[in-house]
């Protein structure tokens, strides 16, 4: 395994590699993978954070395709072309807004990962990169979200050969710490 991270994106540092789950700190928009996951809002028409960055980088054709999808319910996922991104596809999923943990947020977040991975499998996507869904403006606690992400990815990969590799992309050191902690609990 000779410096695999340079194939994904120049300048992203590999943090951890456990079987088919890899953790990276860096910009998901620049990743050279088959698909990136967009932490979208229900309209799929762009917004702030990762969603806005993906829409800006992919170009105006992404917005035009998203308009034809008629939005996306929370916990579901839809797929589009990657347009100007290095990734061939964008899988858009709508995470839950944190409301204290008593409104089904955990299951909705788990569903985001499952539905995205199911689309990846169905489209024969070998490499996929996830941001930390719902942990930004939607306020989902980072460690709790990381535990859900890791458990859903692990469970799916145990039953499916595709995707071959799942990247969990952290936007900062604290985000990486949360994912590493969650991974250490399942080892």
UniProtKB/Swiss-Prot annotation:
Entry superkingdom: Archaea
Boundaries of every Macro domain copy: 8-187
Cysteines engaged in disulfide bonds, as pairs: none
Gene3D superfamilies: Leucine Aminopeptidase, subunit E, domain 1 (3.40.220.10)
CDD domains in the record: Macro_OAADPr_deacetylase (cd02908)
GO molecular function: deacetylase activity
UniProt family annotation: Belongs to the MacroD-type family.
Stated name of the protein: Macro domain-containing protein MM_0177
Species of origin: Methanosarcina mazei (strain ATCC BAA-159 / DSM 3647 / Goe1 / Go1 / JCM 11833 / OCM 88)
